[in-house]
Structure formats: C-alpha cells, structure tokens
From Swiss-Prot:
Record's protein name: Myosin heavy chain, muscle
Top-level lineage group: Eukaryota
Subunit structure: Muscle myosin is a hexameric protein that consists of 2 heavy chain subunits (MHC), 2 alkali light chain subunits (MLC) and 2 regulatory light chain subunits (MLC-2).
Compartments (UniProt record): Cytoplasm, Myofibril
Length: 29
C-alpha cells in the first residue's frame, strides 16, 4: 500500500542517518 512503501522509505532513510552517525563516531574529526 502507499503507507507501507512510505514507511519503508522512511525506515531506509533512518538507517542511513544512523549509519552516518556510527561512521562519525568511529572516525575522529
């Protein structure tokens, strides 16, 4: 359904953000 695909897209987006923070935490700035 429309809402399901929207939720999947949002979930993937959150995973990317989480990964970005994880990478930032591992590397000294």
């Amino acid at each position: 359904s429309k809402y399901e695909s929207e939720g999947v897209a949002r979930s993937e987006e959150l995973q990317e953000v989480h990964q970005a923070f994880a990478d930032a935490g591992r590397k000294p700035i």
